[in-house]
C-alpha cells in the first residue's frame, strides 16, 4: 500500500511540474513575429564589431563635454586597437560577453573648477589591456527585468600625460577615477537600464491622456533611420556619384491632385497621418546554450491606433526556427493589422482619370462606342476587409472584395458604363532555392477564383457573359501558365539589401505563419564608408555631432 502511495505521489508531482511549465509558457503573450538567433550569428556579429570599432573610433573627435564643474574640448580618439569580442548564450538565463582591448588613447583640453580654484590645460589619457567581463540575465515575472549579475571592468594601466607645469596634474588621481567610473557605469549600469527600458515599451493608445504624437526629429541631428536609408541608397547614377542624395537632399514626389490631367488618387489618409509598428516585447528573450528567441507584437499602427479586428494566435509552431543563423516566424496577424487600417480608414479607395488621348487600348474601342470625346473615370473601393490566411500546405491566401466602376464624363452627359462587385482569392506559395549569391524565388502556386461577379449599366449583360467566360477559362490559365514558367525558369534574384546579403535561404509555411531561415553576410566596408560620409555631412551643419579629424 505504501509503495502504491509513493508511486501515486510521484505521478502527481510530475503532472504538477508539467502543468507548471505549461502555465509559465502560457503567461507569455502571443507575438506576431518571432526571431531566433543562434550562436553562429552572434559569433559573426562579434567579428564584425571587432573590425568595425577601430575604423569608427580612430581619429574621431567627439563634441565638447560641459558639466557644472568641467568643460572638456578638443577631444580626439586614436590608437584604438582591434578588440577581441565574444558572446555566449547561457541556458535559461541570458548572455555572457567578454571584451578585451589592447590600447585606447584620447587627448583633450580641460577646464575644471573646484570651489574657488580653477585648473586648465591639455592632457592625454592612454588605457592599456582593458578587459570587460559581464553576464546579463533576463528574468520574467509578468514583466521582464535585466540585471548584470557579473560585471568586471579591469585594466593593466591607465596613464595620464600633462604638459610641463600643467595645473591639471594636481587632479591626476581624480581624473583617473572619473574615467574608470564612467567605463564601469557604461558597462554595468547604462546597458542594463537601456535593455530594461526597451523591454518595458508599450504603445500608448491615442485616447490616453499620456499619449503624445511622434514629432519629427531634428533634420540636422544624427538619425539611425536616416543613416539606414543612406546605406540603402545607390552610390552612383550613370557612373557619377549622387552626392546630393547622400547628403540628404532627396527630391520628393508630390501626390496627384484633383487638378491633374490624367489621374486622381482619393484617400482618407492626410499628410498628418502616420504609420508605426508595435514593438512591444510580448515574448521576452528565452535562452538555451545554442540560441535566443524573442517575440515582438509587430502589429501595424495607424495614427497610434492598434487594429482591433486582427487577433493574435495563442499557438504558433516555433520549433522549426532551428536551421540557420537567423530564423523569423511571421504571423498572418501582421498583414491583417495592415488590412484592418486600409479598410477602416478607406485607404484602399482610389480613382483614376484618363483623357481620351491617354486611354488604354482595352478601353479605346469602348470609348468610341459610348462617347469618343469623354474622359474616363475608373474607381474602386473595398467592400469587405481583406483577410490573409496562411496554410502549411496551400500557402498564403488573400481574400479581396470590392466594387469597380467605369464612367464616361462628357460636357453635358455622364455615361455610367460598368459596375462590378468582385471577390478574389489570391493564393501564393513561393519557395526559395537557396543559393550562396542570390537564391532563386519560385512562384509555385498561383490560384485565383473569381465569384459573385455582378455588373450594371447599359452594357451589363454582354460584358458579364464575356467576363464570366474569358476570365476564368481563357485569360487566367494563360496568365498563370506564363507566370509559373517565367518564375520557375528564371527566378527572382534576392537583392543585397542595405549591405545585408541573405545566403542559403529557406522559406516554409506553417499554419498561420511564414518561416524564413537564413544565413547572412554584411558588407562592412560599405557600411564604414557610408557611416563616415554621413557623419561628415551632418557634422558640417551640426557642431554638436562628432567629426573625423586627422592629427
UniProtKB/Swiss-Prot annotation:
InterPro entries attached to this UniProt entry: Bactericidal_perm-incr_a/b_dom, BPI/LBP/Plunc, Lipid-bd_serum_glycop_C, Lipid-bd_serum_glycop_N
S-S bridge residues: 151-232
Gene3D superfamilies in the record: Bactericidal permeability-increasing protein, domain 1, Bactericidal permeability-increasing protein, domain 2
Signal sequence extent: 1-20
Any Gene Ontology CC annotation: extracellular space
Region entry Disordered, spans: 241-265
Gene Ontology terms describing biological process: lipid transport; positive regulation of engulfment of apoptotic cell
Locations listed in the record: Secreted
Pfam families reported for this sequence: LBP_BPI_CETP, LBP_BPI_CETP_C
The keyword Disulfide bond is annotated on this UniProt entry: yes
Quaternary structure and partners: Interacts with ttr-52.
Protein family per UniProt: Belongs to the BPI/LBP/Plunc superfamily. BPI/LBP family.
Name by which UniProt lists this protein: Nose resistant to fluoxetine protein 5
Amino acid at each position: 500500500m505504501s509503495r502504491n502511495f509513493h508511486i501515486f505521489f510521484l505521478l502527481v508531482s510530475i503532472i504538477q511540474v508539467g502543468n507548471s511549465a505549461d502555465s509559465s509558457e502560457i503567461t507569455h503573450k502571443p507575438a506576431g513575429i518571432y526571431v531566433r538567433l543562434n550562436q553562429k550569428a552572434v559569433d559573426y556579429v562579434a567579428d564584425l564589431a571587432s573590425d568595425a570599432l577601430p575604423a569608427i573610433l580612430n581619429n574621431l573627435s567627439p563634441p565638447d563635454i560641459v558639466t557644472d564643474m568641467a568643460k572638456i574640448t578638443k577631444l580626439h580618439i586614436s590608437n584604438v586597437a582591434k578588440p577581441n569580442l565574444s558572446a555566449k548564450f547561457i541556458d535559461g538565463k541570458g548572455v555572457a560577453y567578454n571584451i578585451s582591448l589592447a590600447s585606447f588613447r584620447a587627448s583633450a583640453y580641460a577646464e575644471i573648477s573646484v570651489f574657488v580654484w580653477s585648473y586648465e590645460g591639455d592632457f592625454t589619457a592612454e588605457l592599456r589591456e582593458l578587459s570587460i567581463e559581464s553576464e546579463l540575465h533576463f528574468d520574467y515575472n509578468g514583466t521582464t527585468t535585466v540585471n548584470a549579475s557579473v560585471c568586471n571592468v579591469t585594466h593593466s594601466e591607465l596613464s595620464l600625460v600633462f604638459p610641463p607645469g600643467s595645473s591639471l596634474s594636481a587632479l591626476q588621481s581624480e581624473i583617473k577615477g572619473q574615467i574608470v567610473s564612467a567605463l564601469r557605469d557604461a558597462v554595468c549600469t547604462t546597458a542594463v537600464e537601456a535593455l530594461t527600458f526597451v523591454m518595458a515599451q508599450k504603445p500608448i493608445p491615442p485616447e490616453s491622456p499620456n499619449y503624445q504624437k511622434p514629432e519629427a526629429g531634428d533634420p540636422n541631428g544624427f538619425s539611425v533611420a536616416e543613416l539606414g536609408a543612406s546605406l540603402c541608397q545607390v552610390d552612383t547614377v550613370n557612373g557619377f556619384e549622387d552626392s546630393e542624395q547622400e547628403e540628404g537632399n532627396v527630391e520628393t514626389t508630390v501626390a496627384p491632385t484633383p487638378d491633374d490631367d490624367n489621374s486622381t488618387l482619393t484617400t482618407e489618409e492626410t499628410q498628418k497621418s502616420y504609420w508605426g509598428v508595435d514593438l512591444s516585447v510580448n515574448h521576452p528573450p528565452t535562452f538555451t546554450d545554442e540560441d535566443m528567441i524573442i517575440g515582438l507584437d509587430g502589429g501595424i499602427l495607424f495614427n497610434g491606433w492598434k487594429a482591433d479586428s486582427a487577433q493574435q494566435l495563442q499557438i504558433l509552431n516555433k520549433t522549426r526556427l532551428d536551421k540557420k543563423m537567423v530564423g523569423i516566424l511571421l504571423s498572418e496577424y501582421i498583414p491583417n493589422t495592415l488590412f484592418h487600417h486600409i479598410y477602416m480608414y478607406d485607404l484602399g479607395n482610389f480613382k483614376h482619370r484618363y483623357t481620351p488621348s491617354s486611354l488604354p487600348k482595352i478601353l479605346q474601342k469602348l470609348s468610341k462606342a459610348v462617347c469618343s470625346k469623354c474622359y474616363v473615370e475608373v474607381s474602386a473601393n473595398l467592400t469587405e476587409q481583406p483577410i490573409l490566411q496562411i496554410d502549411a500546405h496551400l500557402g498564403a491566401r488573400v481574400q479581396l472584395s470590392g466594387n469597380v466602376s467605369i464612367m464616361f464624363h462628357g460636357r453635358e452627359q455622364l455615361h455610367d458604363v460598368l459596375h462590378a462587385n468582385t471577390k478574389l482569392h489570391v493564393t501564393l506559395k513561393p519557395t526559395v532555392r537557396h543559393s550562396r549569391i542570390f537564391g532563386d524565388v519560385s512562384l509555385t502556386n498561383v490560384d485565383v477564383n473569381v465569384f459573385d461577379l455582378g455588373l450594371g449599366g447599359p452594357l451589363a449583360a454582354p460584358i458579364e457573359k464575356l467576363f464570366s467566360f474569358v476570365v476564368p477559362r481563357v485569360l487566367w490559365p494563360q496568365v498563370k501558365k506564363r507566370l509559373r514558367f517565367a518564375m520557375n525558369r528564371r527566378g527572382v534574384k534576392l537583392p543585397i539589401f542595405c549591405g545585408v546579403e541573405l545566403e542559403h535561404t529557406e522559406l516554409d509555411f506553417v499554419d498561420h505563419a511564414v518561416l524564413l531561415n537564413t544565413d547572412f553576410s554584411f558588407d562592412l566596408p560599405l557600411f564604414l564608408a557610408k557611416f563616415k560620409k554621413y557623419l561628415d555631412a551632418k557634422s558640417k551643419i551640426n557642431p554638436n555631432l562628432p567629426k573625423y579629424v586627422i592629427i
